[in-house]
A protein has these predicted regions:
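Short, gly/Ser/Thr-rich active-site loops of penicillin-recognizing serine hydrolases
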Residues: 211-240, 347
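Surface-exposed amphipathic alpha-helical segments
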Residues: 184-186, 193, 197-216, 322-347
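N-terminal mature ectodomain segment of secretory-pathway/periplasmic proteins
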Residues: 35-118, 144-182, 186-193
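Sec/Tat signal peptide C-region and signal peptidase I cleavage site
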Residues: 30-34
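Bacterial N-terminal signal peptides
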Residues: 16-28
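Short, solvent-exposed recognition patches
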Residues: 227-319, 331-336
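Acidic/charged, solvent-exposed loop-and-adjacent secondary-structure segments enriched in E/D, K/R, S/T
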Residues: 114-133
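Bacterial N-terminal signal peptides that target proteins for export
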Residues: 3-19
Length: 347
């Protein structure tokens, strides 16, 4: 058996080596006992934890700073969330790196401020699974395609957290590792892992305060006081892509269509009107795949594929249309999905 040599002291915090080792042993034991031998109990606990994470993002008061990491990209944001009993949710999300951006939200009404253009984009929120929210469906449905592992306790941003790993049951999706606040269930850190366990993307609070009073007034006032800003309301509307002749039925377990919409996209050619683009979004509860359809005649591009962190993109041509698939899934998943897409014009 290999011998492990320990230093007499650890320089971080100047803690005795004995205390450091004891903490490590306790953590390991906690993880071992947390998983247990009962898969039914593990699945039930994991489903409850997932649902609690999603509910906490909507029902808790919190404010803090979180960091998004993907490859060499590191971006910090400040978030404030107030959950009121009679007046819904108020949220402020502000970028701290790069060009300034601020998003203010009251329930599903979103106001995105772009200072360098003195622009305010007003639109309805389309997705409710942005960090620190998580799910696009129930925790039980997520576990139909992911295998849960309860990994015990840890600490994130100074708070005690419970750790859950979700391993895919197939090769169509990535694994996830989640840290949730032990007291409230709020998601503190989320990692997307490749098949080798390497981190592709991470979102993590570096500082957060949960509970107590959060003043909604600055958010409400910011929403009301838009004088001097150019207000833009993109005309987003629901669309029935199947009625138009599109057959979008992914032969990938777990993915369900959660919404379809049409929105204008700026033309690549100066002086040309916006291009109508149809979008269908499919989700397995954690990962999402978007399918964009736009006419070839109004957009010059090429077929191809690419990736950035966990996000992959695939561009294909189907007759007179460009099909773009975008999602936090392996490239092979997009390829398989694309192979099933058909267009049969309605007569």
């Amino acid at each position: 058996m290999q011998r492990v040599r320990l230093n007499k002291t650890t320089y971080w915090g100047r803690l005795p080596a004995l205390m450091f080792c004891a903490a490590a042993l306790i953590s390991a034991a906690s993880g071992a006992f947390a998983q247990g031998d009962d898969p039914v109990a593990t699945r039930r606990a994991a489903a409850e934890m997932l649902n609690r994470i999603h509910e906490a993002a909507q029902q808790q008061n919190y404010e803090g700073t979180f960091v998004y990491q993907r490859g060499a990209t590191v971006q910090s944001s400040r978030i404030t969330h107030a959950a009121t009993r009679g007046d819904g949710e108020y949220e402020s999300l502000e970028s701290l790196d790069g060009k300034p951006r601020k998003m203010l939200r009251h329930d599903d009404d979103m106001y995105t401020f772009v200072p360098e253009r003195h622009l305010c984009v007003v639109e309805k929120r389309q997705n409710k699974d942005s960090f620190p929210a998580l799910l696009a469906t129930s925790g039980e449905q997520v576990l139909s395609v992911y295998e849960p592992k309860l990994l015990g306790s840890d600490r994130v941003a100074g708070l005690d957290a419970q750790v859950l790993e979700l391993d895919p049951k197939d090769s169509y999706r990535f694994a996830y590792k989640l840290w949730a606040d032990s007291k409230t269930g709020l998601l503190l850190r989320a990692q997307t892992l490749d098949p080798d366990g390497q981190v592709l993307e991470q979102l993590s609070f570096s500082q957060v305060r949960i509970g107590g009073g959060v003043d909604k007034a600055p958010i409400a006032n910011g929403i009301r006081n838009t004088a001097g800003w150019t207000i833009v309301r993109p005309p987003v509307q629901p669309v029935d892509m199947e009625a138009q002749g599109w057959q979008l039925t992914p032969n990938i377990p777990g993915f369900r269509k959660i919404r379809e919409l049409r929105r204008p996209m700026a033309s690549r050619e100066e002086g040309q009107p916006p291009i109508p683009v149809d979008q269908a979004v499919f989700s397995d509860g954690l990962a999402a795949i978007s399918v964009f359809v736009e006419p070839v005649e109004k957009n010059s591009r090429k077929e191809g594929a690419g990736s950035n962190g966990a996000t992959h993109v695939l561009v294909k041509r189907r007759g007179d249309f460009w099909i773009t698939l975008l999602g936090e899934v392996p490239q092979a998943t997009l390829q398989q999905f694309a192979s099933t897409i058909e267009y049969k014009p309605s007569k």
